[in-house]
């Protein structure tokens, strides 16, 4: 497999291969279309319509109608296409340092966005036509050094690679940037918008902390701990009702977090004293970057305090040191009554309410390089999680919405072979 993705409402699955592409219904799982295009490295669907966007060569995108077997349009770009995003209003094409935004009704180019280098194509476009937001890493301007470059040297990009995890929220309808969310200290590794375009989930390169923010105002609503040690996040996915968030990584555990509980409200950060902030910023940081404070474990929440609140008095620091050996939930609850919400969060990290363990060895295929990658989605019709792995496996797990805990494998499929797991 070269590429795999779910459509916007998770009712279909598209797979790109060296021999073409295939489209499947997810419930019940069945193949509904096969395309014989050679070497499809990207494929994206528009909901359950017959419109698909495919990439076969590095700089070329073809939009075609699978039902009629016709090409709607072809687009060629100045550099390699890294990703495609679309909804019923907009069509976005990501290059390493640019995003091209089109009106999907007539495929007219609306806007070109310059970005920092984004080789991992970190970007999300909401499925909603009303809350039509595009999210991507905030470009970091290049600082002027005064050094003169040779006349024959190619021009430098105005931006450099991000060193922190800030997300720019761009209104793809009005074509204006509307907010910046300071989500993590370390650079981003994965972001996702919910179906309604009202929630943003983020993960940094460290992968221990997952955060959820409101869109477009950028208020931090939830903070979850995926694990203690660093991990590469492959996929973030909300369910259709935005009550669950599913996270896959390079570990064999998939985490499901519940969004329906109390929010971890954060006070709004003060505006910049010089008044130059173009957008309101929601500040929240974690220990993704740098060494953890003394006395904390790997991935500790100790540094997960807004910058404005991070300075503590000697008395408070002494209290932390004296109590670190015996601090439990009950003590944290008592002390929490006297401390700001931002500080008490570090004692009560929200854990997953359900999880999934992927089968060891997957479908038996040997991995060509690196860990088994996975893409996840939550069914829109039942409490089930769908997982697609890079070795060609498609798994369906049932989740107990009351008790949580470990999900139960219900079905699994692979290529021409399919089976139903024992009850």
Swiss-Prot record:
WD repeat boundaries on the chain: 1-34, 183-223, 228-267, 367-407
SMART domains (UniProt xref): WD40 (SM00320)
Annotated GO biological process: autophagy of mitochondrion; glycophagy; nucleophagy; pexophagy; protein localization to phagophore assembly site; protein transport
Record's keyword terms, sorted: Autophagy, Endosome, Membrane, Protein transport, Repeat, Transport, Vacuole, WD repeat
Membrane topology (UniProt): Peripheral membrane protein
InterPro entries in alphabetical order: PROPPIN, WD40/YVTN_repeat-like_dom_sf, WD40_repeat_dom_sf, WD40_rpt
Subcellular compartments: Preautophagosomal structure membrane; Vacuole membrane; Endosome membrane
Disordered: annotated segments: 260-320
GO CC term, one of those recorded: fungal-type vacuole membrane
Molecular function GO labels: phosphatidylinositol-3,5-bisphosphate binding; phosphatidylinositol-3-phosphate binding; protein-macromolecule adaptor activity
Motif window: L/FRRG motif: 224-228
Physiological role: The PI(3,5)P2 regulatory complex regulates both the synthesis and turnover of phosphatidylinositol 3,5-bisphosphate (PtdIns(3,5)P2). Necessary for proper vacuole morphology. Plays an important role in osmotically-induced vacuole fragmentation. Required for cytoplasm to vacuole transport (Cvt) vesicle formation, pexophagy and starvation-induced autophagy. Involved in correct atg9 trafficking to the pre-autophagosomal structure. Might also be involved in premeiotic DNA replication.
Comment text on domains: The N-terminus might form a beta-propeller domain involved in specific binding to phosphatidylinositol 3,5-bisphosphate (PIP2), leading to the association of the protein to the membrane. The L/FRRG motif is essential for the cytoplasm to vacuole transport (Cvt) pathway, for the recruitment of atg8 and atg16 to the PAS in nutrient-rich medium, and for its recruitment to and dissociation from the PAS under starvation conditions.
Subunit structure: Component of the PI(3,5)P2 regulatory complex.
Protein family: Belongs to the WD repeat PROPPIN family.
Name of the molecule in the record: Autophagy-related protein 18
Annotated organism of origin: Sclerotinia sclerotiorum (strain ATCC 18683 / 1980 / Ss-1) (White mold)
